[in-house]
């Protein structure tokens, strides 16, 4: 009886190990990246930034990814992040999928702590936005901004390297 139980436990452990290694392999073959980080809107509340995350699944198996949380930093200092959602997206084998748009609100009060004389710069920022020149808008602020995201790929935590929006 003990031999049967031992064989069953060894079989279950082996099956579990194979599953974990396969999940790790699929996660390693999956690449994730930020797509088109941009300023979407400028209001009295602050700057509204948007971005998408692209998932490139080069494996033969489908991948489950949670909706990423996008974080905005300046020189490594946390500024704000998108709202976390309990949403899982299945990425089909050998395909590229863009995950829903993430929106981040960067309040003027947060920017005030980073930018001296921000009040004098706001008119130039608004003028740049009205002209449709978001790159110039970020240059007007004079604040280095980076974005990164965190997610779970097949249950394994993933954090992207920071992407400079303005450096």
Label every PLM stretch briefly.
Residues 107-167:
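Terminal connector regions
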Residues 63-69:
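Short coil-to-beta strand junction motifs in C2/discoidin
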Residues 55-62:
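Asparagine-centered strand-capping/turn motif at beta-strand->loop junctions
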Residues 18-47:
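Low-complexity, acidic Ser/Thr/Pro/Gly-rich terminal tails and inter-domain linkers that flank the onset
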